[in-house]
Amino acid sequence: MAKNPNNLIIRHQDEVAKERSACGHRYRLLSQGDNDVAAWAHAVDIDGAKTHYHKISTELYYVLEGEGKVLLDGEEQEVRPGTMVHIPPGVVHGAVGKMRVLVVGIPDID
């Protein structure tokens, strides 16, 4: 990871541990541990994400690889590479299928 006095962060997924999460396996590319960061970003290998919601965080999913469906308040939506999904606070969401997704949360996860 490269970090400088201006709080610029450059990080490759090989520099962070692969972790199990409710959505599959994730790589925390940007998260709470980074000073002065107002959001988080994870590369997630989704393999059946359990439904959940966030009280104050908005999430953005950008599908990088694979195909599947996201569940948004009980409604299924098909997604494929190039699809962006905006998930406002309070929306119960999850995913089915095998896909790699860039997930960004604003503000940091609650």
Residue spans of the language-model regions?
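Short, conserved beta-strand element in jelly-roll/cupin
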Residues: 43-45, 54-70
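A short glycine-rich, His/Asp/Glu-containing loop-to-beta-strand
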Residues: 16-51, 104-109
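Ligand-binding loop in jelly-roll beta-barrel domains
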Residues: 89-110
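Structural motif
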Residues: 60, 67-69, 76, 92, ...
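A generic fold-level signal
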Residues: 22, 34-36, 55, 79, ...
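Catalytic-core "active-site belt" of small-molecule-metabolizing enzymes
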Residues: 2-20
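Short acidic-glycine-tyrosine-enriched beta hairpin
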Residues: 74-89
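Histidine-centered catalytic micro-motifs
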Residues: 50-56, 91
